[in-house]
């Protein structure tokens, strides 16, 4: 299990800062896919009418986890940066710190 604190002091690339400042940490989440992106418009047009599925549907899934991406927002200048972590099954943001001799809880 990976437990990441909700704030961290790290380097800020913003024009005003360019030094280590406090950052607010959140987990990145992919936005909703646009219906008007060129690929989606082309796909929808191709799918129209008779003829069933026109493009291959991917079935050979190999990965069991996704890489965790952190979104760091500078408290001073509000500049946002992204930082990817390694793959993990369990990710926690701002959870309780681990105590010695304590049982694992999921």
UniProtKB/Swiss-Prot annotation:
<comment type="similarity">
    <text>Belongs to the eukaryotic ribosomal protein eL42 family.</text>
</comment>
<keyword id="KW-0687">Ribonucleoprotein</keyword>
<dbReference type="GO" id="GO:0005840">
    <property type="term" value="C:ribosome"/>
</dbReference>
<dbReference type="InterPro" id="IPR053708">
    <property type="entry name" value="Ribosomal_LSU_eL42"/>
</dbReference>
<dbReference type="GO" id="GO:0003735">
    <property type="term" value="F:structural constituent of ribosome"/>
</dbReference>
<dbReference type="InterPro" id="IPR000552">
    <property type="entry name" value="Ribosomal_eL44"/>
</dbReference>
<dbReference type="InterPro" id="IPR011332">
    <property type="entry name" value="Ribosomal_zn-bd"/>
</dbReference>
<dbReference type="GO" id="GO:0006412">
    <property type="term" value="P:translation"/>
</dbReference>
<keyword id="KW-0689">Ribosomal protein</keyword>
<dbReference type="GO" id="GO:1990904">
    <property type="term" value="C:ribonucleoprotein complex"/>
</dbReference>
<protein>
    <recommendedName>
        <fullName>Large ribosomal subunit protein eL42</fullName>
    </recommendedName>
</protein>
<dbReference type="Pfam" id="PF00935">
    <property type="entry name" value="Ribosomal_L44"/>
</dbReference>
